[in-house]
């Protein structure tokens, strides 16, 4: 049916409807009002009800969102549409109206995406957090991971900072000492595709399944939570062309204050004098050196980002379509760092027969990360006494006495000479057929593919760097291919019995298979830097490759039962069979059950303006994780090598046993209990969700003890399912409408509390992990949180010889050195005095958003932060160590130089005889912060200004991301990795953005 015919039919229907209305509504003084109804994005709304208040005089909008109605001059029109706030408009002397309806975000009938289906939010019995496109559309960030930070309770998101890198996401704490990343499902296809490959403008909504009753449908992959991403679909109506354009400039939120040349020379003289070495005679007068080179300023720059998306969507009552293309181009705030991404999205569905609906979703992305060989740590450590280049234009570097000049190469040169890039090409798609077998029964079959290709390429030219030259040029290349195929088949039963018993049932199968193939090689010695194809390399350095496969076969079912809209039951079971495990442990069953009671639907429930709706939920279930299990972990593995045989010792090819067979390895399991409630208060103006959970991980993979008689000395060669971890906590989400009317003010508050503890490692012997300068920083031990910091406890500074003498034996100690506590106490400072010195896991995660709207203007302010965690500032080991030829932070200007001069910063002494810089609480700091994450100001251009341009809507946005941070942390930024160690991290950027959204 073409557009003209649809208009005629809608007009005939409208006229017929009007003809049946009471004649009294059309008095002699009536006039005809023409108008159009749109949403906040300028899209017309089809089927909206437009009526005269207090009468039965009403009409509906046609396929173009237009209406006409005859009313008196003093009439008030009431406009309503499902999912939007009702609106009243006085006619007055107007003859035409443009009405914009705002979405009612508090509607209980909001649809939530769950595994293999959707549910109304009011019918949920589990813990699910959701975000719609409007919640993230004004965020001036490069990927959706950055945009969701702090906005969903129970979700910890840590930004990597570097363009193109993925954020780190944890759901309800760290459930394992191994991989505990959530499963990502995009348009129904489980994938390990990084979410930074998705164009944020294509995302319709994001749902996070948190408790077992929600995640058990994904069985052995649901233990760490599930992130459901749904891309945009076409809507019924004429085609809509949309353009989104964003331009941004970025800079570092904070940079370190380092010594200038004269300050460093004075420090070097102190280090030499205090260690009995000869000071550099050229630095006898440090002030003569001036400021020298600020290497941080040389490495950092202003970054730029541009992000464009063009989309076209529409549909009829039989079919819908959405097509978009996007381009993101970003230059990092560090020299030579660049990132570019192209995306294509195509979604369509068609009711090809009354009994058959076809759907397809295709996501394609291509990206490239590019950089030279930058080194944040060496940039901080490089001495300011050297220029970037010498008088002849050559890169400078230290030469001569290493005690004075050190061994840190010029950190800027390699960013220009070296080349490194990663190219990625991703295809994620599915096609499904939904067959209606009966009004209450459907069969859905989906075929999906997840194809990824990525190529690494790096080239390092031969160069006479000082003090250590690169003797041979080298090139490294790797080609990686991954194909994952999915085939889902399941029945959907949905029926209501006796008007009160509603039953929904999903049952079916899922099969997934993956093939991964990689090849890498490195060749050295290229005659010309400009011609470095692999064939031109003279020396083969290394070559390698491998091919692996895995498969997963599953049976799953979910039952939803509802009685009288009051009592709700959800029961789920999934049985998975994985090729990663031996025959006796290949299959696992993962059940869950949850109940909900909508108390507000009971007849006795008080009807008032305070508590309008109350639903109480409880659930329990078991899910699994195989993320940390290799494809062939249950088998013994061998490496190829050579071995001398016979009397002559002739080398022959041989196989060497690498790991023991482990046929008993199986899934890690998580049993989770969840109790919560959802409430609506104050005439639906406040929405409160609360959840309390206990999350117990069992059968966690830990190192197995192996008898030395086996021939294996390294206990990491095999693992056993014997570990236990517990996470407990609660989550609160509160959304309020504070002011309604011409001025609107809404607030959102999200809070998460989580405690983490290792219950068992199958041994009382701790594991020490994460090294800095060849010393372990973190520890795994029974009855402690995951990754606690482990080291010495400081006790001020020795001020004189008497204090040194009266203290426990501390080798190398002299006045001005750090004093360490003797915790044993055995009178000697040694490894036995190390203890837990901090917990990197945040106990509190919180955020608050405020949005004010008035006459087309919208101001949004978003705060986000964490508390209860510590950070190990590993940068300070070298940058306040004052024991080697490294530049230092200006903190060392307050160093100890005599009794009473300092109680926190030790003396400068080359070689560090007291080990002042050993792992200790000296480097542990409070990691709490409150960040003004974003401010955005948007303006919706009035419709009368747009008519001449044939625009439906236009929106201009000015925004800033990472505006300011309140923190006691002295490092560059308190947002560090989940292990809590801050070491040469890529800095977080502050972004200033201007955006334009046009809808035609």
Predicted regions and their residues:
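Short, small/polar-rich motifs associated with maturation and membrane association
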Residues: 1-345, 350-353, 357-361, 365, ...
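Glycine-rich, aromatic-lined ligand/substrate-binding cores of catalytic
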Residues: 839-872
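Switch/connector loops and helix/strand junctions flanking conserved nucleotide-binding motifs
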Residues: 121-122, 217-219, 237-238, 252-254, ...
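Extracytoplasmic gating/loop element in the C-terminal half of outer-membrane beta-barrel translocons
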Residues: 284, 296, 467, 539, ...
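Acidic, glycine-rich flexible loop segments
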Residues: 274-291, 305-309, 376-412, 419
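Conserved small-residue
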Residues: 242-290, 720, 739-840, 880
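Extracellular/periplasmic, surface-exposed regions of secreted and cell-surface proteins
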Residues: 136, 174, 181, 275, ...
């Amino acid at each position: 049916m073409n557009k003209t015919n649809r208009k005629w039919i809608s007009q005939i229907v409208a006229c017929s409807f009007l003809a049946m209305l009471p004649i009294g509504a059309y008095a002699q003084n009536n006039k005809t009002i023409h108008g159009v109804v749109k949403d906040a994005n300028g899209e017309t709304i089809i089927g909206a009800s437009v009526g005269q208040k207090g009468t039965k005089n009403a009409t509906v909008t046609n396929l173009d969102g237009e209406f006409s109605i005859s009313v008196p001059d003093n009439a008030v029109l009431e406009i309503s549409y499902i999912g939007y706030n009702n609106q009243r408009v006085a006619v007055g002397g107007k003859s035409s109206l443009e009405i914009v309806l705002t979405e009612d975000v508090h509607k209980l009938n909001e649809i939530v995406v769950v595994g293999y289906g959707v549910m109304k939010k009011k019918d949920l019995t589990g813990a699910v957090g959701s975000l719609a496109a409007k919640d993230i559309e004004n965020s001036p960030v490069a990927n959706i991971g950055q945009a969701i930070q702090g906005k969903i309770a129970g979700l910890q998101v840590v930004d990597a900072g570097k363009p193109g890198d993925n954020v780190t996401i944890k759901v309800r704490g760290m459930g394992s000492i191994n991989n505990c990343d959530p499963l990502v499902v995009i348009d129904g296809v489980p994938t390990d595709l990084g979410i930074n490959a998705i164009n944020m403008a294509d995302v319709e909504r994001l749902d996070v399944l948190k408790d077992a009753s929600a995640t058990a449908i994904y069985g052995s992959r649901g233990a760490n939570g599930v992130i459901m991403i749904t891309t945009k679909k076409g809507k019924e109506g004429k085609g809509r062309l949309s353009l989104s354009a964003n331009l941004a400039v970025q800079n570092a939120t904070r940079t370190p204050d380092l010594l200038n040349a004269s300050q460093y020379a004075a420090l070097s003289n102190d280090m030499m004098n205090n260690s009995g070495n000869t000071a550099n005679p050229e630095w006898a007068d440090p002030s003569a050196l001036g400021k020298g080179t600020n290497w941080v300023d040389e490495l950092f720059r202003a970054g730029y980002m541009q992000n464009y998306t063009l989309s076209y969507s529409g549909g009829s009552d039989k079919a819908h379509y959405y097509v978009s293309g996007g381009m993101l181009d970003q230059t990092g705030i560090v020299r030579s760092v660049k990132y570019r991404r192209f995306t294509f999205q195509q979604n369509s569905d068609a009711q090809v027969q009354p009994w058959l609906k076809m759907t397809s979703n295709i996501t394609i992305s291509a990206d490239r990360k590019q950089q030279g060989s930058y080194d944040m740590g060496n940039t901080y450590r490089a001495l300011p006494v050297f220029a970037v280049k010498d008088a002849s234009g050559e890169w400078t570097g230290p030469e001569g006495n290493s005690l004075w000049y050190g061994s840190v190469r010029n950190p800027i040169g390699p960013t220009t000479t070296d080349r490194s890039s990663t190219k990625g090409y991703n295809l994620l798609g599915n096609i499904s057929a939904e067959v209606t077998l009966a009004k209450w029964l459907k069969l859905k079959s989906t075929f999906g593919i997840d194809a990824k290709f990525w190529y690494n390429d790096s080239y390092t030219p031969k160069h006479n760097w000082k003090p250590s030259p690169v003797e041979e040029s080298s090139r490294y290349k790797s080609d990686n291919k991954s194909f994952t195929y999915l085939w889902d088949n399941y029945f959907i039963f949905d029926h209501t019995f006796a008007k009160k018993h509603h039953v929904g049932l999903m049952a079916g199968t899922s099969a997934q298979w993956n093939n991964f193939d990689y090849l890498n090689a490195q060749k050295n010695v290229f005659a010309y830097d400009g011609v470095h194809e692999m064939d031109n390399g003279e020396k083969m350095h290394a070559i390698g490759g491998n091919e692996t496969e895995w498969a997963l076969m599953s049976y799953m079912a979910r039952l939803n039962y509802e009685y009288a809209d009051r009592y709700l039951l959800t029961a789920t079971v999934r049985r998975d069979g994985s090729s990663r495990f031996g025959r006796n442990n290949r299959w696992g069953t993962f059940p869950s059950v949850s109940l909900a009671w909508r108390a507000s639907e009971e007849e006795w429930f008080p009807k008032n303006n305070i508590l309008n709706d109350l639903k109480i939920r409880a659930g329990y279930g078991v899910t699994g994780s195989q993320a940390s299990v290799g494809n062939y972990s249950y088998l013994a593995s061998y490496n190829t090598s050579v071995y001398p045989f016979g009397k002559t010792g002739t080398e022959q090819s041989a196989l060497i046993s690498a790991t023991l067979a482990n046929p008993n390895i199986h899934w890690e399991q998580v049993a989770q209990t969840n109790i919560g409630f959802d409430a609506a208060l104050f005439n639906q103006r406040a929405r409160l969700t609360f959840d309390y959970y206990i999350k117990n991980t069992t059968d966690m993979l830990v190192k197995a003890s192996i008898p030395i008689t086996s021939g294996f000395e390294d206990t990491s060669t095999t693992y056993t399912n014997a570990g236990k971890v517990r996470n407990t906590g609660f989550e609160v989400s509160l959304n309020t409408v504070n002011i309604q009317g011409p001025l609107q003010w809404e607030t959102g508050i999200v809070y998460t509390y989580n405690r983490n503890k290792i219950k068992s490692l199958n041994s009382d012997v701790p594991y020490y992990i994460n090294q800095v300068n060849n010393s372990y920083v973190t520890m795994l031990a029974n009855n402690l949180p995951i990754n606690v910091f482990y080291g010495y406890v400081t006790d001020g500074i020795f001020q004189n010889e008497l204090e040194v003498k009266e203290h426990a034996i501390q080798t190398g100690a002299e006045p001005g050195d750090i004093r360490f506590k003797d915790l044993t106490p055995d009178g000697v400072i040694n490894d036995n005095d190390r203890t837990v010195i901090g917990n990197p896991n945040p106990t509190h995660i919180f955020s608050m958003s405020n949005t004010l709207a008035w006459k087309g203007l919208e101001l949004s302010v978003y705060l986000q932060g964490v508390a209860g965690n510590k950070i190990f500032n590993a940068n300070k080991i070298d940058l306040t160590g004052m024991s080697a030829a490294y530049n230092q932070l200006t903190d060392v200007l307050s160093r100890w130089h005599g009794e009473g001069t300092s109680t926190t910063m030790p003396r400068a002494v080359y070689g560090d005889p007291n080990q002042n810089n050993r792992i200790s609480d000296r480097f542990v700091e409070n990691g709490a912060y409150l960040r003004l994450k974003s401010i955005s100001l948007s303006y919706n251009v009035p419709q009368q200004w747009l008519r001449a341009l044939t625009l439906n809507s236009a929106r201009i946005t000015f925004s800033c991301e990472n505006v300011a941070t309140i923190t006691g942390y002295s490092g560059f930024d308190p947002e560090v990795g989940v292990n809590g160690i801050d070491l040469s991290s890529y800095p977080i950027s502050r972004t200033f953005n201007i955006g334009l959204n046009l809808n035609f």
